[in-house]
Amino acid sequence: MKMTDFNTQQANNLSEHVSKKEAEMAEVLAKIVRDKYQWVAERKASQHLSTFQSDLLPSDRSFYDALSGDKTVFITECKKASPSKGLIRNDFDLDYIASVYNNYADAISVLTDEKYFQGSFDFLPQVRRQVKQPVLCKDFMVDTYQVYLARHYGADAVLLMLSVLNDEEYKALEEAAHSLNMGILTEVSNEEELHRAVQLGARVIGINNRNLRDLTTDLNRTKALAPTIRKLAPNATVISESGIYTHQQVRDLAEYADGFLIGSSLMAEDNLELAVRKVTLGENKVCGLTHPDDAAKAYQAGAVFGGLIFVEKSKRAVDFESARLTMSGAPLNYVGVFQNHDVDYVASIVTSLGLKAVQLHGLEDQEYVNQLKTELPVGVEIWKAYGVADTKPSLLADNIDRHLLDAQVGTQTGGTGHVFDWSLIGDPSQIMLAGGLSPENAQQAAKLGCLGLDLNSGVESAPGKKDSQKLQAAFHAIRNY
């Protein structure tokens, strides 16, 4: 057989495999919808519309208003499982989830499909009574009965999928929802559905980055479809759905979408509080913490990491006991800052205090890093700090989880209060940015796409004394996008 014949055969086999998989996934969606019609019929029999329709009151939480405004908005989701991932969150504590989302979300999505998502309509009132935001009922809506049922259980909005509904069905469900002052998230996944959404006058259009035929995600779908929505329906709110895991992805898509619906990536994280901060604000650190009150201020402002400096000459130096006391102030992920210390000493401090990362601020070379890696507990990250004057430093290649770039003034790196030339950053994907960050430049710095910002002297009233107002102002600036 010729090589070209072999390649052609391979391509044909792959094409058949893909077509078969797409057909299988299309059948999965079709089966979900068939099952939903059966569910509706059974639910109508056990909970007839006449038993609650006359008691329905219009929603008093506007979904449309909640998603309007200049800032990027977030719809955070309560999702226990999904067909593509199976069980996502074993400890599905709705009270805890709602308490976290209440501090960050603009609207909250609740999965109510029982068979495929392990959801329930009973989840809606449980969430709604604990939050101030409008609550979205996310289900495979195929009948106006479901809209009324969603409102009966407290939903302020519903999801309508154009991959499931034809135009006539959509209009019927839309009329039912709007009659109760409920909002609608109209979901599209391709160009044809997009044009239908525009023709139907959808006010909030969700672009599903997941291919419903093979369950893969592609964030470029938002980039491809959003400009058409902007052109044809400039007043519509565009929401990017599925596949959002990092703040860098959010920043990348923020120029295309007005907001994001995020579920699976948050639900998979044990520490939901920090997970929401990471995706909405970035993985930001407040360094130079010396007191539990300051740790609490950093945490309340929105930090993910807290820095403890074990360098004696620093104005913000801590020893083991003061570090332990400081850590009692807030459940941050704590980073120990060291400079040319013995590897055994660093490993001992990290292990004893349960630090999440080590930040090396001295002349530590690759050999030192490699040795330290073998001494640290599994999962502890190593960050390497580099002083930046007027040229980009050479970054170590191996066993470094993050590179921290800080301003260098003379021979001093860190704690200078100076800003270096940010054009020297290069690829920001593994960079923590430090050096002279303050409420005045935090918004600009956050636009650079780094993993996170490292705040210190710019949010202090005195060395080692964090200022609550400056911290709040800095994180407000970071969130202002």
UniProtKB/Swiss-Prot annotation:
Where is the region N-(5'-phosphoribosyl)anthranilate isomerase?
A: 284-481
* Domain of life (superkingdom): Bacteria
Region (Indole-3-glycerol phosphate synthase), start-end ranges = 1-283
Q: Which reaction does it catalyse?
A: N-(5-phospho-beta-D-ribosyl)anthranilate = 1-(2-carboxyphenylamino)-1-deoxy-D-ribulose 5-phosphate; 1-(2-carboxyphenylamino)-1-deoxy-D-ribulose 5-phosphate + H(+) = (1S,2R)-1-C-(indol-3-yl)glycerol 3-phosphate + CO2 + H2O
Record-linked CDD domains? IGPS, PRAI
What keywords would UniProt list here?
A: Amino-acid biosynthesis, Aromatic amino acid biosynthesis, Decarboxylase, Isomerase, Lyase, Multifunctional enzyme, Tryptophan biosynthesis
Pathway listed for it? Answer: Amino-acid biosynthesis; L-tryptophan biosynthesis; L-tryptophan from chorismate: step 3/5; Amino-acid biosynthesis; L-tryptophan biosynthesis; L-tryptophan from chorismate: step 4/5
Q: What is its EC number?
A: 4.1.1.48, 5.3.1.24
Subunit text: Monomer.
Q: Which family does it belong to?
A: In the N-terminal section; belongs to the TrpC family. In the C-terminal section; belongs to the TrpF family.
> What this chain does, per the record?
Bifunctional enzyme that catalyzes two sequential steps of tryptophan biosynthetic pathway. The first reaction is catalyzed by the isomerase, coded by the TrpF domain; the second reaction is catalyzed by the synthase, coded by the TrpC domain.
Q: What is this protein called?
A: Tryptophan biosynthesis protein TrpCF
Say which species the protein is native to: Vibrio parahaemolyticus serotype O3:K6 (strain RIMD 2210633)
